[in-house]
Amino acid sequence: QTMKRKLVLPKMRISSPEEFLLLYPFAREVFADGIERSIQRAKNKKKQRKTYSGKKKQHTRKSVIVSDNHRRILIVTKAKSGRRHDKRLADKESVFENLPQDVEVFADTAFTGEQRVHSKTYIPQKKPRGRELTASEKEMNRIISSFRVVVEHAIGGIKRYRCISDKLRNRKAFIDDKFLLLSSGLWNYHLSFT
């Protein structure tokens, strides 16, 4: 209740660009990234396959986080199985479709292809097969990464809270979403005093 009154809780879903502008009128740049948190391994083999993340080599749940340039978390998607890709999760939740076209989005290479949905999306260029990146492409990647570090700091701020950084053993439905939402709200509340 208190965090809701202080307007520090991020939104789980934005339904239109107008709603985004109404909630965050001063956000001109946003930064998107995925967050993975480890969970307890299921006993059932099918459930194990569903939650196993090849990237982290453990069983995880995954969400997409959108923050502004002040490290404040604006949007947190629902947690899905760790096997899913960041882009697929963002597409399912319509994260990029519901951002206004005049807002610049900085993301990592996991979101390649989102430029078709949102025109002002800046993503580092991958090295093409068989050749190297040019010096100007490398410099552009460095610039994009220097902007993107903001969302990494925001994720680090969320992971200060042990309910996010430790392995989740609670099997109640949607408890991981609540933990992530509350940790994001506490991080935003902390930022309002610094």
Model regions and ranges:
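Short, well-ordered secondary-structure "scaffold" segments embedded in the functional core
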Residues: Q1, L7-T194
